Amino acid sequence: MQFRLDLRIGGAEGALLRVLGMIERRGFTASSVQAQRQADGSWQLQMTVDGQRPGHTLAMQLGKVYDCLAVEVSAVAGEAA
C-alpha cells in the first residue's frame, strides 16, 4: 500500500532524522520526500511511503515523535488509508 504523508516538524536538531527513522522502523519505505524550510524554522514535509501496515497507525506513531507538530495521511491512487 502507498500513502502520502504531510508533516510539519520543528527545527530542533535531529528532528528530520527522528521522523525518517520512525518511518523505517515501523516497516515503511520512503519512495519520495520533499522538504521545505519555513520562516519559523520548522520543516514542511511531503512524503510518499510504501508499507503493508495501515497508514493511520503510522500517523499516530509519528504524532508521538518529539518535535512532530502535525501529521496527516492519505491514500495514494485509490489505496485505503
Language-model features, listed with the residues they occupy:
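A conserved regulatory-domain signal marking ACT and ACT-like small-molecule sensing domains
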Residues: 1-81
